[in-house]
């Protein structure tokens, strides 16, 4: 087994004390064990740091970084990817859930299919109260939140993803060299553009195809009250101008990038 593992699991965290231990326990219980976990704490004000430090002391596959200043979410996502030295990489949201064979199934597919740059499991949405009760918000029909993008033609791949218009595939397992090429967080770490995850996927489609594995599952937590994108942008301290013109910024970037 490679000391650094085959895949880096990047977990950017901020005030996740209620769920982070359970999330890491779920990851370390995966059927596939050849990994490194990198946790980057963006100056949490709760007990996230204390919990993560304790966990990392008990498992040498877990590397923990604490930052004395909150550098913002984009910066934190970029930080964990920048530290990756393995063949594969995946971003993890602290409150989402994988099926037990998520890593095993998706890595196996990428190992056997060189023309694919990323792979994710079929996806459903849920809401979890922190008493550990889980409520399925909506049963996901096939390819509702993620879809295979497997055309050999780059332009057709881009068009397919633009028509699909969902950002969940940002949480795919990627080939590290390809996601570092595509990483919008590195290109513009403090740029107030809401669609950074969407832009990253569009860029990586230049390099290859995206797969959806129907035998593994990615369960994405969403708010039961369905906060709007605008409210979430306000929470992240986007300015009114950035919120108003976020779509314009994306369009400008897209036409510059793809012509």
Locations of regions flagged by a protein language model:
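Nucleotide-sugar donor-binding/catalytic module of glycosyltransferases
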Residues: 1-233
């Amino acid at each position: 087994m490679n000391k650094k593992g085959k895949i880096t699991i990047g977990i950017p965290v901020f005030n996740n004390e209620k769920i982070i231990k359970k999330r890491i326990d779920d990851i370390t219980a995966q059927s596939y064990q050849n990994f490194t976990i990198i946790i980057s704490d963006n100056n949490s004000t709760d007990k996230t740091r204390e919990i993560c430090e304790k966990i990392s002391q008990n498992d040498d596959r877990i590397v923990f970084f604490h930052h004395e200043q909150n550098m913002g979410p984009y910066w934190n996502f970029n930080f964990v990817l920048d530290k990756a030295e393995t063949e594969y990489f995946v971003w993890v949201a602290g409150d989402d859930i994988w099926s037990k064979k998520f890593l095993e199934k998706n890595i196996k597919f990428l190992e056997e299919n060189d023309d694919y740059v990323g792979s994710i499991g079929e996806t459903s949405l849920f809401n979890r109260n922190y008493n550990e009760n889980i409520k399925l918000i909506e049963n996901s029909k096939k390819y509702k939140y993620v879809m295979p993008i497997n055309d050999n033609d780059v332009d057709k791949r881009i068009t397919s993803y633009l028509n699909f218009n969902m950002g969940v595939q940002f949480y795919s397992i990627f080939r590290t060299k390809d996601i570092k090429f595509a990483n919008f967080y590195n290109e513009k770490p403090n740029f107030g553009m809401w669609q950074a995850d969407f832009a990253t996927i569009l860029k990586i489609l230049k390099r290859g195809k995206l797969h959806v594995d129907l035998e593994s599952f990615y369960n994405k937590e969403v708010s039961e009250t369905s906060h709007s994108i605008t409210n979430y942008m306000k929470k992240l301290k986007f300015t009114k101008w950035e919120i108003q013109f976020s779509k314009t910024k994306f369009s400008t970037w897209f036409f510059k990038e793809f012509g």
